[in-house]
């Protein structure tokens, strides 16, 4: 796994139009190598945009959080492999993960199991009908992801250290809910700064609003990259 901050920062293109996404990618230029595309942009023509990004040499994390019957998940993953994506999320349910791993075998696609959304706190987990607190549920799903042969998991930085003890050093730990010091949390409830997340064991950081909504996105991304590099090179 690369130790370069540039390979570990994933800018979330949580934007309503392709034109806005293209503007951000153009603004960030060679400073940023990795982008995340989720539902909002995907359903505005973003899947073709994702192909174009990959073809231009950028890495693309397709945040689709797949969950369905085994065959449906497998067929979806097969097509996503053909798109040239670098990362793909699915909910960390054992059968779905196993189907995805089998479908992606032999490719470079890194499959990520989503444990508990970083917008959820303990009460949200209870309200959803789970008998566990978020931390316990994250660790259980991390173990299931490891057993299924997944490439990594998605979890908050708060759980990253404990997750590392379970999955080891080779799997990716991708962390959303990253907020630079002084930034607003927005709809995230379990957040950390870039430096805190790297120290906790996160391998990749997903940052959206603090960059794409910044007055100067390039300066914002460079500040985050510098903070990450300071920890990675220490």
Swiss-Prot record:
It is an enzyme of class 4 (lyase). GO terms for molecular function: orotidine-5'-phosphate decarboxylase activity. HAMAP family: OMPdecase_type1_B. The active site is at 65 (proton donor). Catalyzes the decarboxylation of orotidine 5'-monophosphate (OMP) to uridine 5'-monophosphate (UMP). One of its GO terms (biological process) is 'de novo' UMP biosynthetic process. Pfam families: OMPdecase (PF00215). It catalyses: orotidine 5'-phosphate + H(+) = UMP + CO2. Keywords: Decarboxylase, Lyase, Pyrimidine biosynthesis. This is Orotidine 5'-phosphate decarboxylase. SMART domains: OMPdecase. The gene is pyrF. GO terms for cellular component: cytosol. Homodimer. Its EC number is 4.1.1.23. Pathway: Pyrimidine metabolism; UMP biosynthesis via de novo pathway; UMP from orotate: step 2/2. Substrate binds at residues 14, 36, 63-72, 118, 179, 188, 209. Belongs to the OMP decarboxylase family. Type 1 subfamily. SUPFAM superfamilies: Ribulose-phoshate binding barrel (SSF51366). The keyword tRNA processing does not apply.
């Amino acid at each position: 796994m690369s130790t370069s901050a540039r390979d570990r920062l994933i800018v979330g293109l949580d934007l309503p139009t392709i034109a806005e996404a293209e503007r951000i990618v153009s603004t960030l230029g060679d400073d940023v190598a990795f982008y995340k595309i989720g539902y909002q942009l995907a359903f505005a023509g973003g899947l073709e945009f994702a192909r174009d990004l990959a073809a231009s040499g950028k890495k693309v994390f397709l945040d689709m959080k797949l969950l369905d019957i085994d065959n449906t998940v497998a067929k979806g993953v097969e097509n996503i492999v053909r798109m040239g994506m670098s990362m793909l999320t699915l909910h960390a349910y054992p059968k779905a993960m196993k189907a995805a791993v089998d479908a992606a075998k032999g490719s470079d696609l890194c499959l990520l199991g989503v444990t508990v959304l970083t917008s959820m706190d303990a009460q949200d987990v209870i309200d959803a009908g789970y008998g566990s607190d978020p931390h316990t549920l994250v660790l259980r799903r991390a173990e299931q992801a490891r057993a299924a042969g997944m490439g990594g998991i998605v979890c908050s930085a708060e759980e990253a250290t404990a997750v590392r003890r379970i999955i080891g050093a080779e799997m990716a730990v991708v962390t959303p809910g990253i907020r630079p010091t002084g930034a607003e949390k927005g709809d995230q409830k379990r957040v950390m700064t870039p430096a805190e997340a790297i120290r906790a064991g996160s391998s990749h950081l997903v940052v959206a609003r603090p960059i794409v909504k910044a007055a100067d996105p390039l300066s914002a991304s460079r500040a985050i990259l510098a903070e990450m590099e300071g920890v990675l090179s220490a």
